Amino acid sequence: MTLKLQMLGTGGAFSRNYFNNNALIFDEDFTLLVDCGVTAPMALHQIDKSWESIDAVLITHTHADHVGGLEELAFQMKLKHNRKMPLYLAESLVEPLWENTLKGGLYQEGTIMSLDDVFTVIPLPVGKAADISPGISLELTHTRHIPGRDSYSLYLNGRIFYSADMTFDPDLIHQLVRDRRCDVILHECQLEGAGHVHTTLDELLTLPEEIQEMIYLMHYADNKNDFEGRIGKMRFLEQQQVYDL
């Protein structure tokens, strides 16, 4: 079954033009929201989609451009729709997502006292594929981003790598292509500067051309147009466009 991808946003954390790097991944009957940043509510509004049209949400890590829209999602589902949306995430993210991120805005004595009061929390194993729907299988892969904070990239349907925010890991990319038949790579990209917590364009350009041809770039800065024609064999993912994966 062919998956489809629609990026709600393709921008980095400080982008003003492209919204936060959040995505809809869907098959015929199921829509998964991958990350739900500050701009997700407006991004959904712009493509005429409601929270009700989403079947589940998955979080890769707890920075605001990836989780900042969860407070609205939780309140909308609880107060307006009277249901809890399934929330997929690594076990290691459950406590910090509530205690360090959502509790301050969502907590209501006797009503909302934990993440489970507003979401159906479904911890996912790391390094083992799990079926999210009949057409979507995914595996969490721990990847490096911020020291001391967990971040998880995704391996979808045994062939599609979707990077969380991560520093360059060429060994992982080569291993996925060589040993696991990966043929689509959706990769975050810092267009310029040193890659202390992100993967840079210069680093991705060191990959062989046959791998570059598999790569779609996302999580980029607002000066993206300045880099057209300077990204080797790679391509930019475009906001709101629907892709067959």
Swiss-Prot record:
InterPro entries reported in the protein's UniProt record: Anti-Pycsar_Apyc1 (IPR056308), Metallo-B-lactamas (IPR001279), RibonucZ/Hydroxyglut_hydro (IPR036866)
Natural source organism: Paenibacillus lemnae
Chain positions recorded as Zn(2+) 1 binding sites: D65, H66, D165, H219
Binding partners and assembly: Homodimer.
One annotated GO molecular function: metal ion binding
Function according to Swiss-Prot or TrEMBL: Counteracts the endogenous Pycsar antiviral defense system. Phosphodiesterase that enables metal-dependent hydrolysis of host cyclic nucleotide Pycsar defense signals such as cCMP and cUMP.
Protein name: Anti-Pycsar protein Apyc1
Catalytic activity: 3',5'-cyclic CMP + H2O = CMP + H(+); 3',5'-cyclic UMP + H2O = UMP + H(+)
Keyword match Lyase: no
Any single Pfam family the record assigns to this protein: Anti-Pycsar_Apyc1
Family as reported in the entry's similarity comment: Belongs to the anti-Pycsar protein Apyc1 family.
Keyword line: Hydrolase, Metal-binding, Zinc
General remark: This homolog of an antiviral immune evasion nuclease may be due to cryptic prophages, or it may play a role in regulating the endogenous antiviral defense system based on cyclic nucleotides.
